[in-house]
Amino acid sequence: MTQSNPNEQNVELNRTSLYWGLLLIFVLAVLFSNYFFN
């Protein structure tokens, strides 16, 4: 009955990967805006 632990870990992994993806998109947007404005 230890099936809840992998599920919770998968949810946390998906959440952290989602935050890293949003952070990467934000950084790329800032870099592209600086490149185009320059």
Swiss-Prot record:
Belongs to the PsbL family. It is a single-pass membrane protein. Disruption phenotype: Plants unable to grow photoautotrophically, although under low light (10 umol photons/m(2)/s) on a carbon source plants are green. Young leaves have residual PSII activity, PSII present mostly as monomers rather then dimers. Highly photosensitive. PSII is composed of 1 copy each of membrane proteins PsbA, PsbB, PsbC, PsbD, PsbE, PsbF, PsbH, PsbI, PsbJ, PsbK, PsbL, PsbM, PsbT, PsbX, PsbY, PsbZ, Psb30/Ycf12, at least 3 peripheral proteins of the oxygen-evolving complex and a large number of cofactors. It forms dimeric complexes. InterPro entries: PSII_PsbL, PSII_PsbL_sf. One of its GO terms (cellular component) is photosystem II reaction center. Required for PSII activity, may be involved in dimerization as well as contributing to the unidirectionality of electron flow. May prevent reduction of PSII by back electron flow from plastoquinol, thus protecting PSII from photoinactivation. One of the components of the core complex of photosystem II (PSII). PSII is a light-driven water:plastoquinone oxidoreductase that uses light energy to abstract electrons from H(2)O, generating O(2) and a proton gradient subsequently used for ATP formation. It consists of a core antenna complex that captures photons, and an electron transfer chain that converts photonic excitation into a charge separation. This subunit is found at the monomer-monomer interface and is required for correct PSII assembly and/or dimerization. The chain crosses the membrane at residues 17-37. It is found in: Plastid, Chloroplast thylakoid membrane. It comes from Nicotiana tabacum. The lineage of its organism: Eukaryota, Viridiplantae, Streptophyta, Embryophyta, Tracheophyta. SUPFAM superfamilies: Photosystem II reaction center protein L, PsbL. This is Photosystem II reaction center protein L. Keywords: Chloroplast, Membrane, Photosynthesis, Photosystem II, Plastid, Reaction center, Thylakoid, Transmembrane, Transmembrane helix. GO terms for biological process: photosynthesis.
